[in-house]
From Swiss-Prot:
Keywords in alphabetical order: Methylation, Ribonucleoprotein, Ribosomal protein, RNA-binding, rRNA-binding
Post-translational modification as stated in the protein's UniProt record: One or more lysine residues are methylated.
Description of how the protein assembles with itself and partners: Part of the ribosomal stalk of the 50S ribosomal subunit. Interacts with L10 and the large rRNA to form the base of the stalk. L10 forms an elongated spine to which L12 dimers bind in a sequential fashion forming a multimeric L10(L12)X complex.
Record GO biological process: translation
Gene3D superfamilies (alphabetical): Ribosomal protein L11, C-terminal domain (1.10.10.250), Ribosomal protein L11/L12, N-terminal domain (3.30.1550.10)
Species classification: Bacteria, Pseudomonadati, Pseudomonadota, Alphaproteobacteria, Hyphomicrobiales
Organism: Nitrobacter winogradskyi (strain ATCC 25391 / DSM 10237 / CIP 104748 / NCIMB 11846 / Nb-255)
SUPFAM superfamilies recorded: Ribosomal L11/L12e N-terminal domain, Ribosomal protein L11, C-terminal domain
Family: Belongs to the universal ribosomal protein uL11 family.
Name used for this protein in its record: Large ribosomal subunit protein uL11
Domain of life: Bacteria
SMART domains: RL11
Function statement: Forms part of the ribosomal stalk which helps the ribosome interact with GTP-bound translation factors.
Pfam family, one: Ribosomal_L11_N
Gene Ontology CC terms, in alphabetical order: cytosolic large ribosomal subunit
């Protein structure tokens, strides 16, 4: 018989840097989960990732206080800022450009994010990436 799911918890944790301090510890602790068990398992799975890359994680909490977690790909903004070599997006997107991206960079980001996006083709994923880039004040060069 399958375990009864009591809830889900979504967190964004830096790769290889999960520790019991806030915000991870209190979020897991108030749900009665073993904080150190999660931290060790998460850090072990993110060893191959670049340090401090933000990794979205969805934790499934069961009635017996056990859990499983699923890691997603890093946020699109992280990839866009890395590709454009900027620290943050434009304060006034649409007016001031924070940087530029090439179509090849957009395609590369779309292929990385494809499994987490709600689309079937790379072209559809590319249009989502371009929309996110525009909202950050990045221009896409042909």
């Amino acid at each position: 018989m399958a375990k009864k799911v009591t809830g889900y918890l979504k967190l964004q944790v830096p790769a290889g840097a999960a520790n019991p301090s806030p915000p991870i510890g209190p979020a897991l602790g108030q749900r009665g989960l073993n904080i150190m068990e999660f931290c060790k398992a998460f850090n072990a799975q993110t060893q191959k990732e670049e340090k401090n890359t933000p990794i979205p994680v969805v934790i499934t909490i069961y009635a017996d206080r056990s859990f499983t977690f699923e890691m997603k790909t890093p946020p699109m903004a992280y990839f866009l800022k890395q590709a454009a070599k900027i620290q943050s997006g434009s304060k006034t997107p649409g007016r001031d450009a924070a940087g530029t991206l090439t179509r090849a960079q957009v395609r590369e980001i779309a292929e990385k994010k494809m499994k987490d996006l709600n689309c079937d083709t790379v072209e559809a994923a590319m249009s989502m990436v371009e929309g996110s880039a525009r909202s950050m004040g990045l221009q896409v060069a042909e």
